[in-house]
Amino acid sequence: MKIRLDQYLVQHGLIQSRERAKAMIMSGVVFVNEQKVDKAGEMIKEDAKVEVRGHDIGYVSRGGLKLEKAMQCFPLTPKGKVCMDIGASTGGFTDCMLQNGAVKVYAVDVGYGQLAWSLRTDERVVNMERTNIRNVTLDQLAEPIEFFSVDVSFISLHHIFPVVQAITTPDAMGVCLVKPQFEAGREKVGKNGVVRDPATHREVLHNAMGYAAANGFKVCGLDFSPVKGPEGNIEYLMFVQKSDEPGALDDSVAEQVVASSHSTLDR
């Protein structure tokens, strides 16, 4: 059985809308069985290997697609809010926040010179490069953060949540990218830094939800990232909000999300 390529991308959670799917296909960043396809109406087999590559996706990097999916799946928006992009890198999340109405974005990253020029020169962006989020305090900011995203590498969310708790407003909400390769024990990380075991993914999500709850956040939603991380790691989106009643979702939710992620992305 065959299906239109643009329809396939939406149905499998790789892109959020047919309009965006058509634009990305036409831009030449969609590959089917290792071959570039630039026609949205191309009919492909259901079991074809489909990948979205490159950065011509409406944002300065793929991070924008991750936040875009989170906003589609969860009741959250940066519109009218002071935001922070933790682990900004080139600024995909920052770009998505601005395109969706953020009034200011603090772009935080330990690196230097990575933030896209279009964002470096945007007066709504506060470029906090060469900055370790673990050292950031409220005194360094003009105001507390209302909306945040976390996309960090080589560090666990266990170390991020105490800082986020201290610099955010009482009703702050955010999206955290949960990366099994940086959350799992070293013995559970496979060749090339890839974590493939669904059981490890479930354990990682359970722990990540615990870190959030322990720091005054309620976990309101889980889903998987529409694009894999480096080396092909499946990663997850966790929607959290500060709450007087912090807590995690039932582990059965994590189990369902992990199963869905593998059936969709490990094709």
Residue ranges and their predicted role:
Residues 79-89:
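Conserved class I S-adenosyl-L-methionine
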Residues 96-104:
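Conserved S-adenosyl-L-methionine
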Residues 158-175:
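A short glycine-rich, Lys/Arg-flanked "PGG" loop and its adjoining helix->strand segment in the class I
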Residues 234-267:
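Flexible, glycine-/basic-rich loop-and-beta segments that form/coincide
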